[in-house]
Amino acid sequence: MSVVILGPLSEGGIKLPLYLFQVPAGFASPAVDYIEKHVSLDELAEVRAPHVYLAKILGDSMIGAGIFDKDLIVVDRSRTAEHGEIVVAALNNSDPICKRLFMMDGVVKLQSENSAYPSKHILEGDNLVIWGVVNYSMRRHGKA
């Protein structure tokens, strides 16, 4: 699964209403008119420019993690990646890819979340560059 880097997010942004209720997928809530506060998508997605950027997913190797083809991901370059986190990384100067980072007992690999794709084992001498940790993913549901 490769990614297309879209660039950093801007500072600031438009504030949207945040309702103080969870949205059920069944019956509507009687609290639909209660606004808790206004927040920006930057605040909700923990965007802290300039080290956070958006990337577009290409492919289906991360569907088991809920990340699908053409989703947008919010990537934080300031975080140190830990075992089990989803990262954007480049292996041996290749194009960046989105995978789950596996680091345990001296084994390091970039793991797909789709059994149709093999994991990429990091071997001695390989050059692994972590471009950032994925904090959020976003998917368009409506028509463009």
PLM regions: where:
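Structural motif
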Residues: K70-D71, E85
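Short, positionally conserved secondary-structure boundary motifs
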Residues: M1-I63, P96, M103-V107, P118, ...
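Short, compositionally biased
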Residues: H83-V108
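A short glycine-leucine-enriched loop at secondary-structure breakpoints
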Residues: G64-F68
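Flexible, small-/acidic-enriched active-site or ligand-binding loops
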Residues: N114-H121
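SH3/SH3-like beta-barrel fold
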Residues: L110-S112
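Hydrophobic beta-strand signal
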Residues: V74-V75, V88
